[in-house]
Amino acid sequence: MLQPKRTKFRKMFKGRNRGLANGTEVSFGDFGLKAVGRGRLTARQIEAARRAMTRHIKRQGQIWIRVFPDKPITSKPLEVRMGKGKGNVEYWVCQIQPGKVLYEMDGVTEELAREAFALAAAKLPLKTTFVTKTVM
C-alpha cells in the first residue's frame, strides 16, 4: 500500500477539501481516469483500483498512478472515553478535487482502456470520467 516513507509530523489537522485540482491534464499516457466529484481516496482504494485495471489489461500497456496518499487519518480505539489526546494513525488518504487525473494508461486500445477504467471506477468512492490526451 502507498504511504510516505517519512513525514515531518506524525499527525495532521482535519482541514477542508476546497478549491480546484492541479494535474488536470493527461500527461504520461494516452487515456486517463479523471475525478468529477470531490472526496478522498484511501491507500487501499487506490491499490484495489490499480489491481483491477492491471488484471484486466493482462500486463500489456502501462499504468501510471497520479495520486499519492499523503494525509494521515487518526482514530481512537473502540470504547475509549473522550479526551486523552489525538488517536493513532489508522490509514492514509489523498484528498481529491474535481478535475484531478487519478490514473493514466498507455499501450492499449481505447476500448480496453475504457473497460479497465470502468472496473477501477467501481472500486472508487468518487464519480469519474474517461478522458483522452489532447494533442495541440
Swiss-Prot record:
Q: Name one GO cellular component term.
A: cytosolic large ribosomal subunit
UniProt organism field: Shewanella sediminis (strain HAW-EB3)
Which superkingdom? Answer: Bacteria
User: Subunit details for this protein?
Assistant: Part of the 50S ribosomal subunit.
Question: A single Gene Ontology molecular function, please?
Answer: rRNA binding
Q: Which Gene3D superfamilies does the record associate with it?
A: Ribosomal protein L10e/L16
Which family is it part of? Answer: Belongs to the universal ribosomal protein uL16 family.
The record's annotation in PROSITE patterns points to: RIBOSOMAL_L16_1, RIBOSOMAL_L16_2
Give all cystine bridges in this chain: none
InterPro entries in the record = Ribosomal_uL16, Ribosomal_uL16_bact-type, Ribosomal_uL16_CS, Ribosomal_uL16_dom, Ribosomal_uL16_sf
List the taxonomic lineage. Answer: Bacteria, Pseudomonadati, Pseudomonadota, Gammaproteobacteria, Alteromonadales
Functional summary from the UniProt entry: Binds 23S rRNA and is also seen to make contacts with the A and possibly P site tRNAs.
Q: What is this protein called?
A: Large ribosomal subunit protein uL16
Keywords carried by this UniProt record: Ribonucleoprotein, Ribosomal protein, RNA-binding, rRNA-binding, tRNA-binding
Q: List GO BP terms, alphabetically.
A: translation
